[in-house]
Amino acid sequence: MDSYFSAKNSTLAGDMNATWPASHGFNATGDPPSMSITRLFPALLECFGIVLCGYIAGRANIITSTQAKGLGNFVSRFALPALLFKNMVVLNFSNVDWAFLYSVLIGKASVFFIVCVLTLLVASPESRFSKAGLFPIFATQSNDFALGYPIVEALYQSTYPEYLQYIYLVAPISLMMLNPIGFIFCEIQKSKDTQNASQNKAKIVGLGFLRVLQNPIVFMVFVGIAFNFILDKKIPVYMENFLDGLANSFSGSALFYLGLTMVGKIRRLKKSAFVVLTLLITAKLLVLPLLCREMVELLDKGDSVVNHTSLSNYAFLYGVFPVAPGVAIFATQFNMEVEIITSGMVISTFVSAPIMYVSAWLLTFPTMDAKPLAYAIQNVSFDISIISLVSLIWSLSILLLSKKYKQLPHMLTANLLIAQTIVCAGMMIWNFVKEKNFVGQILVFVLLYSSLYSTYLWTGLLAVSLFLLKKRESVQLPVGIIIISGWGIPALLVGVLLITGKHNGDSIDSAFFYGKEQMITTAVTLFCSILIAGVSLMCMNRTTQAGHYEGFGQSQNHKPVEPGSTAFEENPAPTNEPELFPSSIPETSCCSCSLGNGELRCPSIEPVTNSSASGPMPSSFEKTDHCVSRCDSQSCILAQEEEQYLQSGDPQLTRHVLLCLLLIIGLFANLSSCLWWLFNHETGRLYVELQFFCAVFNFGQGFISFGIFGLDKHLIILPFKRRLEFLWNNKEAAADRESPVSEEIKMTCQQFVHYHRDLCIRNIVRERRCGAKTSAGTFCGCDLVNWLIEVGLASDRGEAVIYGDRLVQGGVIQHITNEYEFRDEYLFYRFLQKSPEQSPPARTLRDHQEESYKEIGHSSPPSVSPKT
């Protein structure tokens, strides 16, 4: 947090205070604020808490993606239309400020056309029109109803309740006027892709407008306006309760569905996608709010100065609302730019929360005096530090319990998290240090700023480490030097500052404790870290052979196996990347998976006809399995390989790249703050908001780390899910002691054994050595998931995992050491011997089933990577 507040610059503060009139958007008159800030944080907690619950439900596979479609249909086809119809019927158009509406519309149109033109100029010819159609919609369409309305209601319900109705007017107007242009571009791209250049231009335009009319938001707005005049702004009693029931169900279900749709959206992104995402999110969350606010300032000349200022502030907050999920639906319908749009929707949703909080805080602040603002920033920093400290302790515990801190790059990430933890603790201690306690201030300052500079520097060092990890077949990663630099250089800088700097004893702000010298030191540290991180990430992109990053939790570069660590010999890999599981069996790896383009891929599931040692198992599988008892994890080679994979097989490069990019954004904000203070004494409203943003970033970095590393699927989410299921099953078992396995699981297992088991064994089971003289017929969890999807027993990977878990509970399959539940990962499982009651039915039915499998196998697409 780099602030200008100090007694040394009191004259500057006075001049600054004189240049901030009410027209700048702040309440500088001492009048009551135009919005209720006390209700904002509970509203944000409510909205994002429900979103998080939905995300956890999807991540833990409690609700699969197929099941989530039902909730999505209810939200879009019943709850939202009822909400729109109800509010459009009772809307009083005589109270609407139409100047405000067209000002916001002009602001959105400006961003739309800027993004569209720049995309047409820069994008490659192959996908120019699809990008020019979807990117402007992404930058202008907000999540007005699910996220926007609860926040506007919390802020303005008690002061300007009429502002709530603008939500229902701005969204459909922009949809009707801007979205058709984007749809027309997408139809043009669709025509080019199908090589149908002769398609009628009028038909393309008509299809664009037809998609708009099919949108339930637009359709129900027209119907609601018509009934507004027919019913004279009053809903009949017999309809009111029915509409209320549907409309009231929208908010919670829509937010929960939003969380469900976020699972697995950040997937394989091309090397330029992160740059595109950064630009689009900047346009949506920064450029759009500023333009909307300035348009209202220029065009809406109301009679009341207070109301005019409040409307301009409202326009800014409206622009900060995150991207609507509907944009991802449009991208999926056209099958264009799906990865960028869906990933951007997820990121913008969570980035918008702190921006909304900071903006609303500033817009309601009663005065622009320097001293109260400095205390306000201190209070915000203290509050955020408390919550961030808890998040960081949780994230560090995850790294320790999962033992990921022993591997790279998590070892370096742990150092970053420790530095962030010390920053939060230092800020909390600084808040209690007396201003007259010089020694105490010096000691806490050293603790606070040596760790803060360390977080700045660790961003660059982590990016360098990621680049070196990509190149480590030719470059050895100097871990010791990096760790010493990450802690030693910041300590050295603070020591030099203590010796050469001039202490400002009257400052209550730690960011200006040593005045100009401290600002220069901070700026140099930030610039160096940004430069190092930026260059490293660009070089890392250039060295990525496949031209894409992998999704969260997926492996992209694996730690090489040390010689002699297992009894298997290393085979030549098709790329320069080391193999995850080396094998002595020449024709296949131990996991039936191969490395291609730097990533693990499971092969397509089809019958193998070779007669190698690792060939497919015969249907009489039980007779050839020599290791039928549970393996000892201490001696079983396969179990040792699993342990090696779990500890070092997933460096989570995409998570680390995303962490670096988000931290670089905060570093840019801090650098801008320093340079603004050093070279421009004409501070203004944007500068003050920049200070709050810097405070939120510096002491809230723990939220970023928690979001990326704190929700470990297998260490947190799935065990919590299993614990709930255990407690629930205990209650059911108390009522029925004789049925430990549910009838549903029994039925699933019986059907699988009777109709699918033998064919599944022939397709995916491979015989692998598990000891010096023993072998076992095993398969990977991801192999079974792929097979279940291809033969139609599951519609997606989530349902396939549920199916596999039922087979484990029913005793059909088992993990080789019986230590893990069924996972969509490279873990080894075996089929258990058939029990006497599992005898198959007539052979003719099985033959018919196999015939249908063969037809599916010939037409099935290549398998996809496992979901983690």
From Swiss-Prot:
Residues 1-368 are annotated as: PIN-like transporter. Coiled coil: none annotated. Keywords: Glycoprotein, Lipid-binding, Lysosome, Membrane, Transmembrane, Transmembrane helix. Residues 378-715 are annotated as: GPCR. It is a multi-pass membrane protein. SMART domains: DEP. InterPro entries: DEP_dom, GPR155_DEP, Mem_transp_PIN-like, mTOR-Rac_regulators, WH-like_DNA-bd_sf, WH_DNA-bd_sf. Residues 844-857 have a biased composition (Basic and acidic residues). Residues 1-36, 99-102, 153-165, 233-241, 293-313, 366-379, 434-436, 500-518, 680-689 are lumenal. Residues 58-77, 124-131, 187-211, 263-271, 335-344, 401-412, 458-478, 540-658, 711-868 are cytoplasmic. GO terms for molecular function: cholesterol binding. Cholesterol binds at F41, Y55, G264, K265, I266, R655. SUPFAM superfamilies: Winged helix' DNA-binding domain. CDD domains: DEP_GPR155. Its main location: membrane. It is found in: Lysosome membrane. The chain crosses the membrane at residues 37-57, 78-98, 103-123, 132-152, 166-186, 212-232, 242-262, 272-292, 314-334, 345-365, 380-400, 413-433, 437-457, 479-499, 519-539, 659-679, 690-710. One of its GO terms (cellular component) is lysosomal membrane. Residues 550-582, 836-868 are annotated as: Disordered. PROSITE patterns: DEP (PS50186). Cholesterol binds at the interface between the PIN-like transporter region and the GPCR domain; these two regions likely coordinate to sense cholesterol and regulate mTORC1 activation. Homodimer; via the transporter region and DEP domain. Interacts with the GATOR1 complex; preventing interaction between GATOR1 and KICSTOR; interaction is disrupted upon cholesterol starvation. Cholesterol-binding protein that acts as a regulator of mTORC1 signaling pathway. Acts as a sensor of cholesterol to signal cholesterol sufficiency to mTORC1: in presence of cholesterol, binds cholesterol, leading to disruption of the interaction between the GATOR1 and KICSTOR complexes and promotion of mTORC1 signaling. Upon cholesterol starvation, GPR155/LYCHOS is unable to perturb the association between GATOR1 and KICSTOR, leading to mTORC1 signaling inhibition. Binds indole-3-acetic acid and may play a role in tryptophan metabolism. This is Lysosomal cholesterol signaling protein. It comes from Mus musculus (Mouse). The gene is Gpr155.
